[in-house]
Regions:
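Bacterial N-terminal signal peptides that target proteins for export
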Residues: 1-11
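Bacterial N-terminal signal peptides
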Residues: 9-20
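N-proximal helix/coil linker or "cap" segments that precede and/or mark the start of modular domains
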Residues: 21-46
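A short beta-strand-turn-helix
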Residues: 37-41, 46-67
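Short pre-active-site segment immediately N-terminal to redox-active cysteine/selenocysteine motifs
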Residues: 65-67, 71-75, 142
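Structural microenvironment flanking redox-active thiols in thiol-disulfide oxidoreductases
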Residues: 80-119, 130-136
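Thiol/disulfide oxidoreductase modules built on the thioredoxin-like
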Residues: 116-123, 129-176
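Non-globular targeting/processing and membrane-anchoring segments
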Residues: 181-190
Length: 190
C-alpha cells in the first residue's frame, strides 16, 4: 500500500466519522421536546425529595395516578419557558394527572419559593431536590427533562428539552396513560 492510499483511507474514514456525528447530532436535535417512550417500562426509582415545605416525598406518593415529573432549575431558560404550560396542564387535568415540578436548584426553598411566586404559577406543585438525587436516579442529561410515570408507578417515557405541555401533541401522548389510570384508580378504591 502506498502512502497515497493510506492518506486517502484516513481522509475517507475521518469524513465518515464527521458525517455520522453530524447525523447523530441532527437526530438528537430533532428529538428535543418530543416524547421518547421507554422500550420496557421499569418501576420509578425510590429516590426521595421534599415538598416546598420540606416534608419528605417520593414517587410512591403518586401511585394510582399518572405523574409528569419535571426536573428544572431557576437558572435554566428553557425550563422557565415551559413552566406556564405545566401549570396549565396541572390545572386542566388535576383530577387525572399529577405534575411534580422538581427543582434541582442547590439553594433550595430560599431561591425557589420567591421565584415560583413571581412567575405566578398557581396549580403547579413544587418539590425540591437540591442534591440532584432525582436527576441522577433518572440519568438526566440536561434540564429541563420530564419523566412520565404511569398509574402503576412505572417510568413509561421522557421528554428532554422544553415542551408545550398543554399542546394537542403532548395531550395525545398522555391520553393513553390518563385512560388507563382511571381503571387503576377504581381498582385501588375497592
Amino acid at each position: 500500500m502506498t502512502w497515497r492510499s493510506a492518506w486517502f483511507g484516513t481522509v475517507a474514514l475521518a469524513l465518515l466519522v464527521a458525517l455520522s456525528s453530524a447525523a447523530a447530532a441532527e437526530e438528537e436535535k430533532i428529538r428535543l421536546g418530543e416524547f421518547i417512550p421507554e422500550s420496557a417500562p421499569q418501576p420509578a426509582p425510590e429516590t426521595g425529595f421534599t415538598d416546598a415545605d420540606g416534608k419528605p416525598a417520593s414517587f410512591a406518593d403518586f401511585k394510582g395516578k399518572p405523574v409528569v415529573v419535571n426536573l428544572w432549575a431557576t437558572w435554566c431558560q428553557p425550563c422557565l419557558k415551559e413552566m406556564p404550560s405545566l401549570d396549565r396542564l396541572q390545572s386542566q387535568l388535576a383530577d387525572k394527572l399529577a405534575v411534580a415540578a422538581v427543582s434541582e436548584d442547590r439553594a433550595g426553598p430560599d431561591r425557589v419559593g420567591p421565584f415560583v411566586a413571581a412567575m405566578g404559577l398557581r396549580k403547579l406543585k413544587i418539590y425540591l431536590d437540591p442534591k440532584s438525587d432525582v436527576g441522577h436516579a433518572f440519568n438526566v442529561r440536561g434540564l429541563p427533562t420530564s419523566i412520565v410515570i404511569d398509574a402503576q408507578g412505572r417510568v413509561v417515557g421522557r421528554v428532554e428539552g422544553a415542551a408545550e405541555w398543554d399542546s394537542e401533541t403532548i395531550m395525545a401522548v398522555l391520553k393513553p396513560f390518563l385512560e388507563s389510570s382511571s381503571g387503576a384508580i377504581k381498582d385501588a378504591a375497592r
